[in-house]
């Protein structure tokens, strides 16, 4: 048995070594036939001695079970997106902002890398062993793709080398080579299946396939572009580049096209060099990424809620195609904004078929001087968003009809009004305009508002068209018999929707403000307004001066809020929602407490798990009333983690960082003491 064990271990080490050279260093030191022969030997030995198979064996990257669905998984820290620029001025403005946030005399160098056009994922290693992987998702929560990610040959299941942290997060891109993409589509053609439109879509579909064995067949590749150590390594690393090189030493693939630049000229030269090489690479890239190299400066510069301030994507100029304009349709948005949309003969750009593009506003139509049947140039801005660049006027017919922005709403025929300051044209009919009504109602009952399970756009559209609802109040008087008459709505679904409507009555001031759909008032601004006024009646009777005092609420949004509550019909609807429909705002029950004397005053708190005594919203409301600051992410600046049943990864992260942890019993005791 000992000799068999030794033979298995020897074969495993040899194969892992070959995989490291091939996937990480891009060096083939053995033929495919030799590799396959050794692999078969190991597989047959492990098959006879299953007790000797570790999780990091090369054979464990095949033969996994089929997943039924992908569960959601929370990231240890947000997976932020990058700010984009398409020209040198954008990069120079980025550098200027960085200089402002640090001392100008501090040395500044940048780590420049390729911006791979793939799927961003996060991988967690514990004690050097691969334990989980997740997609970016919404940045805070992604899909658990652990079983599929372990099928990617270039992702090591066990790290090698020294100074490996207790827990390590690796972030990077999963992509497919162009050559493999062509082979895959040829295979699909033979089997009469649908084509993948581009390598990125093929990689995304393969990564999320319900069968991990299919993922393994698709030959996906992973490349690391960043990492985070939850516990410091023995050797302190001070730069982003050092971290990447450390990852490389542990067997994690890192793209070799990385340079450290200390001047604008060096960065622009690297950009031009990569732009020239772009079409000769066997994988898609859409630019370069420029990152402040110093980790200390990265921390000092910080991030916004969307992107790090210390990094920017310098993207290549978009690809262009010529086509014919067929029509311009004018869409009415939720807040009445009229948006022109150009429809043209379909064109294929960067692997995607495009047939329409937003023209944004009246000024854009006038700038382009658009006529029907014009020959136009289309591009994908940032290789993503369709954009009408210009008109080739020399090809215009003599009798071509000019496209005119309408003076009346295309849906309700109300006269349109232009806001010069916002550069927007609106229909001010509100809920009497069917287009606004449908979108406003969907927004009112959406996930971040007063969420009603099962109440989607199709059901709302049909309810409006049948005259069953005209405003949010009507939904609270619906009966299951009203819903049953709709398409694809049976008794069971109707009862589910009615019950959900009843439950949504209990909400917070923040959600209620957001649900009203006031122009410019998103989720974050709604939260700031709720925290400032605490009570709805104070908000309804506020003036412009008070609104301007709220951090993050500018002049335009202040005017929008003031105008909304100055409109009699809006005030009447809000009052009816509270008094007649029975909407109950938890915030109105907050006890008047001198928050400065509480245990939680000015403390940064993170919640995890399910709580017995409170819903998550109720607990947040109570803690905010006690002067606490609620955060979604654990860091060294966190004061307390409060946990309930079924807690997640935040609990372990808090332990690693020595953050004070409070259970439900301690929490109840502290809240009771402080509310007395």
From Swiss-Prot:
UniProt key word Ubl conjugation: no
GO process annotations (BP): DNA repair; DNA replication
Residues reported in the UniProt entry to bind Zn(2+): 409, 412, 427, 433
Catalytic activity: NAD(+) + (deoxyribonucleotide)n-3'-hydroxyl + 5'-phospho-(deoxyribonucleotide)m = (deoxyribonucleotide)n+m + AMP + beta-nicotinamide D-nucleotide
Cited InterPro entries: BRCT_dom, BRCT_dom_sf, DisA/LigA_HHH, DNA_ligase, DNA_ligase_AS, DNA_ligase_CS, DNAligase_adenylation, DNAligase_N
Residue ranges annotated for the BRCT domain, each copy included: 595-676
Keyword terms: DNA damage, DNA repair, DNA replication, Ligase, Magnesium, Manganese, Metal-binding, NAD, Zinc
Protein EC: 6.5.1.2
GO cellular component, one term: cytosol
Gene Ontology molecular function terms on file: DNA binding; DNA ligase (NAD+) activity; metal ion binding
Superkingdom of origin: Bacteria
Cofactor(s) listed: Mg(2+); Mn(2+)
Active site, UniProt feature: 115 (n6-amp-lysine intermediate)
Residues binding NAD(+), per UniProt: 32-36, 81-82, 113, 136, 173, 291, 315
Function: DNA ligase that catalyzes the formation of phosphodiester linkages between 5'-phosphoryl and 3'-hydroxyl groups in double-stranded DNA using NAD as a coenzyme and as the energy source for the reaction. It is essential for DNA replication and repair of damaged DNA.
PANTHER family for this protein: CHROMOSOME TRANSMISSION FIDELITY FACTOR 18 (PTHR23389), DNA LIGASE (PTHR23389:SF9)
Entry's family note: Belongs to the NAD-dependent DNA ligase family. LigA subfamily.
Descriptive protein name: DNA ligase
Taxonomic source organism: Buchnera aphidicola subsp. Acyrthosiphon pisum (strain Tuc7)
């Amino acid at each position: 048995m000992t000799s068999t064990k030794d033979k298995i271990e020897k074969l495993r080490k040899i194969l892992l070594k070959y995989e490291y050279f091939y996937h990480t260093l891009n060096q083939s030191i053995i033929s495919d036939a030799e590799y396959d022969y050794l692999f078969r030997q190991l597989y047959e030995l492990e098959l006879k001695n299953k007790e000797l198979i570790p999780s990091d064996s090369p054979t464990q990257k095949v033969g996994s079970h089929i997943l039924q669905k992908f569960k959601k998984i929370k990231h240890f820290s947000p997976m932020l997106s990058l700010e984009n620029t398409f020209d040198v001025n954008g990069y120079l403005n980025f550098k200027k902002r960085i200089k402002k946030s640090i001392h100008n005399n501090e040395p500044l160098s940048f780590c420049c890398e390729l911006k791979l056009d793939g799927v961003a994922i996060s991988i967690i290693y514990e004690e050097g062993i691969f334990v989980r992987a997740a997609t970016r998702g919404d940045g805070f929560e992604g899909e658990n793709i652990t079983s599929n990610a372990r099928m990617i040959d270039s992702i090591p299941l066990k790290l090698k080398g020294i100074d490996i942290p207790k827990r390590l997060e690796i972030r990077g891109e999963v992509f497919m080579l162009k050559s493999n993409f062509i082979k895959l589509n040829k295979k699909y053609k033979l089997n009469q299946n649908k084509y993948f439109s581009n390598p990125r879509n093929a990689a995304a579909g393969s990564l999320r396939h319900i069968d991990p064995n299919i993922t393994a067949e698709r030959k996906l590749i992973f490349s690391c572009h960043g990492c985070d150590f939850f516990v410091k390594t023995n050797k302190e690393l001070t730069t982003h580049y050092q971290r990447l090189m450390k990852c490389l030493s542990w067997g994690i693939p890192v793209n070799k096209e990385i340079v450290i630049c200390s001047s604008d000229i060096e960065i622009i030269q690297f950009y031009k060099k990569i732009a020239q090489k772009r079409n000769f690479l066997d994988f898609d890239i859409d630019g370069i990424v420029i990152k402040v190299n110093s980790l200390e400066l990265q921390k000092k510069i910080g991030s916004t809620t969307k992107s790090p301030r210390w990094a920017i994507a310098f993207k290549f100029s978009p690809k262009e195609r010529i086509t014919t304009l067929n029509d311009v349709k004018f869409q009415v948005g939720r807040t009445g904004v009229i948006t022109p949309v150009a429809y043209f003969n379909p064109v294929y750009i960067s692997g995607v078929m495009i047939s329409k593009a937003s023209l944004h506003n009246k000024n854009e139509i006038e700038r382009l001087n658009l006529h029907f049947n014009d020959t136009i140039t289309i591009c994908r801005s940032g290789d993503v968003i369709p954009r009408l660049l210009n008109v080739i006027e020399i090809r215009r017919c003599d009798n071509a009809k000019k496209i005119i922005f309408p003076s009346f709403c295309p849906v309700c025929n109300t006269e349109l009004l232009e806001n010069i300051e916002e550069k927007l044209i609106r229909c001010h009919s509100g809920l009497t305009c069917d287009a606004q009504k449908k979108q406003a109602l969907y927004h009112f009952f959406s996930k971040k508002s007063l969420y009603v399970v099962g109440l989607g756009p199709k059901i709302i559209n049909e309810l409006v068209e049948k005259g069953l609802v005209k405003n949010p109040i009507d939904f609270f008087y619906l009966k299951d018999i009203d819903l049953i008459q709709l398409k694809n709505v049976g008794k069971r679904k109707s009862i589910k929707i009615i019950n959900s409507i009843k439950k949504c009555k209990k909400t917070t001031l923040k959600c209620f403000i957001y649900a009203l759909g006031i122009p410019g008032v998103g989720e974050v601004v709604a939260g700031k307004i709720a925290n400032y006024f605490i009570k709805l009646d104070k908000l309804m009777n506020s003036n412009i001066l008070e609104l301007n005092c709220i951090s993050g609420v500018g002049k335009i949004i202040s005017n929008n809020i003031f105008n909304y509550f100055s409109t009699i019909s809006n005030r009447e609807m809000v009052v009816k929602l509270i008094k007649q429909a029975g909407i109950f705002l938890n915030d109105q029950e907050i006890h008047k407490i001198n928050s400065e004397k509480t245990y939680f005053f000015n403390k940064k708190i993170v919640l995890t798990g399910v709580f017995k005594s409170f819903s998550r919203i109720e607990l947040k409301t109570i803690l905010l009333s006690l002067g606490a600051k609620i955060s979604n992410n654990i860091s060294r600046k966190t004061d307390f983690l409060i946990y309930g049943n079924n807690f997640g990864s935040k609990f372990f992260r808090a332990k690693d960082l020595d953050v004070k942890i409070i259970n439900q019993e301690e929490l109840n005791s502290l809240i009771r003491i402080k509310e007395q």
